[in-house]
Structure formats: C-alpha cells, structure tokens
UniProtKB/Swiss-Prot annotation:
Protein name, as recorded: Large ribosomal subunit protein uL16
CDD domains: Ribosomal_L16_L10e
GO terms for cellular component: cytosolic large ribosomal subunit
GO biological process: translation
The organism's place on the tree of life at top rank: Bacteria
Keywords: Ribonucleoprotein, Ribosomal protein, RNA-binding, rRNA-binding, tRNA-binding
Summary of subunit composition and partner proteins: Part of the 50S ribosomal subunit.
Pfam families per record: Ribosomal_L16 (PF00252)
Molecular-function GO term, any one: tRNA binding
UniProt record similarity statement: Belongs to the universal ribosomal protein uL16 family.
Function: Binds 23S rRNA and is also seen to make contacts with the A and possibly P site tRNAs.
SUPFAM superfamilies: Ribosomal protein L16p/L10e (SSF54686)
C-alpha cells in the first residue's frame, strides 16, 4: 500500500477540504481517466483496492497511473479507551481529494473496456466519480 517513506511530522490535524482542484484536474499520461466529483478522504487501502479491480479487469492489456497519493496520517485511539491522555497513534494514511481531481488514468485499451474497468474501480471509492476521455486525438 502507498504511504510516505518519511514525513516531517508524525501526526496531522484533521483539517477540512475546501474548494476545487486546479492542479491534477486534467489528463497527463493516459487516454482515459477517473475524475472525482466531490470532496473526499480516500484511504491507501481504497486506492489499492480500486487499482486492483481496474488492473484485473483489463487483464494484461493497457497501463494504469495512480494520480493521488495518501500523504496525511490519521490517528486513532484503541477501542474502549477513555478520552484524554493525548492523541492516538497514526493508524492509516489518507489522500485529501477535491472535486475535479483526476484519480486514475489508463491507456492501451479500448474505450468500452476502460469504462467498465473504471466503473469497477469507482465502486471501491467513497466519492462520486466521472469517466473522462482525452480531447482531440
């Protein structure tokens, strides 16, 4: 699963995700893409599950790019522990996603197969998405 090799700080504030994505909002590598239509916090496990669903559907054909990276640690306290006594330890990593962000890109397969693969991937993600195709050739 994806996670940073090294971070400046061990724990992060929860924060809020506001606004639209301007960076990473257009296709850079592939012919087809999956674009987020809403704000979301996507975990490393969800990113990997969607990637697996996609690559298994296209079998050996094509190439897939993951355009998001989980760089925010989320801390949790253990079950049945009283409040207080400091913040919990980091348990998993998330990527904060804004509307308009490209999540995955794909090339080397026909559009129908790419659309089906992206639909399978979208089913694994906690955000409404849209299938997009590169304009002009």
């Amino acid at each position: 699963m994806l996670q940073p090799k090294k971070t400046k700080f061990r724990k992060a504030h929860k924060g809020r995700v506001h606004g639209l994505a301007y960076r990473g909002s257009s296709l850079s590598f592939g012919q087809f893409g999956l674009k987020a239509m809403a704000t979301a916090r996507i975990t490393a496990r969800q990113i990997e599950a969607a990637r697996r669903a996609m690559t298994r559907h296209i079998k050996r054909g094509g190439r897939v790019w993951i355009r998001i990276f989980p760089d925010v640690p989320v801390s949790q306290k253990p079950a049945e522990v009283r409040q207080g006594k400091g913040k919990g330890s980091p348990e998993f990593w998330i990527a904060r996603v804004k509307p308009g962000r490209i999540l995955y890109e794909m090339e080397g397969v026909d559009e129908q197969l790419a659309r089906e693969a992206m639909q399978r991937a979208a089913a694994k993600l906690p955000v409404k998405t849209k299938f997009i195709v590169r304009e002009g050739g």
